[in-house]
Amino acid sequence: MPHCGTTNSEINLNSNELISYQKKKSNEDLQKKHDKKCSINLKTSQVPDGGFNNQYTQLTANKIEQYNCNDLDKVCIVPSSRSDGMEASFSELLLSPNKLISQPWQTAEEIENWQNDSFRQRNEMFSCIYTNSMLNQQPCSQQQLLATQLLYARLLRSQLAEREFHSNKFNMVHYSGSKKTMLREDELLSTPSSQDNNNNIKLIKDIENSISCVDPPLFEFSNVHQRAEQKNKQDDKNCYSPKLKSNKEALDGYDLQHTCDFIREQKNILIDIKKKLDNLSDSSGKFRKRLSVRQSHIEVNNGSNSALEESVRRQLNGNRKSIENLLEEVKRLYNQWSSAELYYVRSLQRLGLPSEEDGEYTSTPTHTIMALAAIALSNESILPQKTNAVHSKIPDVESESDFFLTSAKPKTLVEIEDIILQLASSVNMHQSSSASTPHESYSDSVKSDCEESNSAPTCIWHSTRQTFRHKKDVEPCSTAAEIILEYASLSSSSNIETSRLLTSASNLTDVTENYNVTTQLPIVFNYNRESSAESIVTDPLLVPEFSTAPSTPSTGSNSGCSTGMVSGIFGLSQNRRKQRLARHIETLTTNSFKSNAIRGNVDNEITNQLKTSPSIRALPTENVSHLITKTLSSANASLTAQELSITNLFKERLCALQGNAGSMKTEIFPMIDAPYDLSIGSKTKHMNLEAKHTSNAQSNESKETTNDKKKPHIKKPLNAFMLYMKEMRAKVVAECTLKESAAINQILGRRWHELSREEQSKYYEKARQERQLHMELYPGWSARDNYGYVSKKKKRKKDRSTTDSGGNNMKKCRARFGLDQQSQWCKPCRRKKKCIRYMEALNGNGPAEDGSCFDEHGSQLSDDDEDDYDDDKLGGSCGSADETNKIEDEDSESLNQSMPSPGCLSGLSSLQSPSTTMSLASPLNMNANSATNVIFPASSNALLIVGADQPTAQQRPTLVSTSGSSSGSTSSISTTPNTSSTVSPVTCMTGPCLGSSQERAMMLGNRFSHLGMGLSPPVVSTSTSKSEPFFKPHPTVCNNPIFALPSIGNCSLNISSMPNTSRNPIGANPRDINNPLSINQLTKRREYKNVELIEASESKTIVAHAATSIIQHVAVNGYHANHSLLNSNLGHLHHQLNNRTENPNRSEQTMLSVSNHSVNSSECHKESDSQAIVSSNPPNAGSSDNGVISVS
């Protein structure tokens, strides 16, 4: 952009130029006629050369002037100071479409392509006109300024699609940014003053001048970038097939003395442009806001809409999007320049060269080459990846930029740096192995320079298909070959020490670890760069091939891109720090890079390397190496001169390197620009990973087993009584002095039964809510999960979902029949054992339902044996709310499952809930007829003698099977009509009875002996000739029969009235706490009454006196059996019975009625004695002759 002057002379000059162009508009028709005439005259007339040229120049100049005048008339509307003029220009400007503005430039495209001077004059004129208008409209309003700025915004965005098409077509790689979005390529200025588009010092001056001018941001932005675009175009035209010149000519082409300053200046310009674009966006937003406010005001007042304002609103919305796109483009360019600066600094660090910021900085050609390469690579990292079709169109020649763009992912900083180093090492490898057999990868693609003399290597940042012209007045551009030669010169002089370096490098590469370099920040280390930087970094034989892709098998030479993670000895000596997102790039083994690579074995080594390498070798690499080696082979003389000149610059460093070369065999070179890595070698790491994998598997298995064992214990939901206990326990503990749990539970149980139905219903509702919540929290939970054995649960995991076929078979008797149909339960269910039906359905081989089962020793138990076995287990105390001696059911029964009777319900644990039907446990009915004389021991505290008034010959055989409790509890006999037998598994079956009095005496003695020893009495069998019932019916008091003892001989026994032993009502389950029926009568205390002795006139009364004295003695002494007293009384009683029962014909009738005794203890009694309640069936006339009695 020219200097935007502010003096009057410059303003007048610009105005004169405008007037002169406007005057030439009148010659438009005349020039059209001359056009036709001149075309005819050129063929027929003889015109001198000078005249012809003048005429031709005049005609073309007139055409350009004509189009420029049209542009100025249609586009550049200079606002005037009058308000009418401002409104008119404002309206016309905003309503003019984009096509109308850009149409004149599109029609003049062909002429402007070859008229660069006129093209520059038009842009300069355009700039002067705009500057003049800006100076004249200082007192104008903000809307005028905004309108002009919006005009240029539309102008700049009009050709975006066309520019993108040209950019993609020619594969342009620009220094200052790809895809310039300001102006078309055909409109760019031609300034042949620069040899490169990034080292033009005049451009910097123009930028500084443009910043000093008070120009709008958009015009400044467009002017800066149109100059940059024109430089790119001029470089494209000037780029030619390079001839390798002498050292002086090569060094004179680089004049970037302050590369970092130049890059930073570009960044500053972009920052300034961004700020001004933001200001423009703010101004546009304010204008849109004011317009919307005015529009709403018009709609309210007039109810009409202005077409002009609607058009302005649409244009403003479009301009807003254009400004946003420009801001994104500026940000992208800024990031690109920032990347270029970073690449440049990092490259200097890796080469060990000082930067501009250091005090010892001296400009060298290497600095210039690194700067150019950094700018090109920064642009390459931002460009999108090209498709494979683009590469397939040009298989013969591949540019370096095409090689860069084949990576699937954006390259990191070190990857881009290593690309340059790999190319340099490829050149050196070709030089070092030129005397020997070349590389297999290179020999296939290398062609002689004579065969390809016409095909020139392409420029690193220019088109691959353009024809380059030779211009003597233009400095040559830097090409890829020149950049590679500069790097090759750095290591060419170090070939003398190659064998030593290979030996040390082979030692280093044995411990090479997989690494990936993702560090983006320049890190400077205070190592001695003088001794190991230059000649080692690019030595070809020390540099293996790397791949950016993971370790995958190779699918072909062109299946991917090997970006060449080559960093020489620095990439092999140390390990880089692995970032969290780093990909592990497997490093090739370096056994093939021994000294025999120089001695003619290069072919075999590279072949083996390619076979065992998991990396992917890419075709673009071969093409580039072919391109480089082909160029080098044709200019050995120029290359030698260039190498000698570059070697002089690093003479001191090479001397230091030669001095330290002897120690390289044993020393490990430090990593210059990479942090320290704490990882281990690849083999060790692989072994550790395998060991870690196995240990993890074992630990996971152990964790699973421990998790199974440590599963949380889920408690059952509390029932109504437990909720009541939880609520009232604290109160009872506070009232009672005793803190024993059993006593407190007795009190709570008694109080629970004293509650009314309404009071209990509250807790039943709470229990229902508790169950519902438990089901929601733990779906699928079962009580088996807590109480079932883990091994059994694992072996048989049943499906809890019931099916139509066998769903009912998986239920137990309690869930299948309910509490009201206990007669249909199996025997184990009535005894709170495992259900036979359930076990059969679960296993298929359970016990049969006929009542027989197996004990723990495997022997089959009959009904009688099973009753005895169960009775022994149920003989314990039940004073607490939880039956500790009871095995829990393992099924998920109904949540209203009953609990054992709490509190002081002594003896209730041996009772089964009554029913209207006879229990299956006692299938025999009681007969009410008179029975024979039977001495019936009930427990260790009481003796029952049952007599019969029938003769012995008429007595029927009976079998009495009893099982007494080992605890010191009092048993009783009671007959209650319409009640079932007790739960105590005692049954009486028919059998032979003892017919003689001697046998009866023996039975009585045996009972007393067992009673004294605290043992269960054995089975006693008595036989008679005739079957008679045990008891004789008598009138009842409160539904309880009173046994009236018949006369003994000629005397009679007077028996006191028995207490009222009322049973719970029909349908009430005394063991079911959740049953709302009142069972408080079961908790009533009963007092023990002394046994009244009945005087008898006959000699048989001695037996009753003896038995009664024993019972009284035992009861008074706290229910403890006195062995000595029992033994003495037994002997006396046995002797008397033997003497007085010799006459078998006498009718002996003796009946001793022992009343029930209840312990009158307090609520907090220390001992909880179990009480046994014996119930018998009522007399039935039509019942069978068999009888049953149950005693515990």
UniProtKB/Swiss-Prot annotation:
**Residue ranges of DNA binding:** 714-782
What are the UniProt keywords, alphabetically?
Activator, Developmental protein, DNA-binding, Nucleus, Repressor, Segmentation polarity protein, Transcription, Transcription regulation, Wnt signaling pathway
Q: Where is the composition biased (Polar residues)?
A: 1140-1162, 1170-1192
Mention any Pfam family matching this sequence.
HMG_box
This protein's record includes keyword tRNA processing: no
Quote one Gene Ontology molecular function term.
transcription corepressor binding
Q: Could you identify this protein by its name?
A: Protein pangolin, isoform J
Identify the species of origin: Drosophila melanogaster (Fruit fly)
Gene expressing this chain: pan
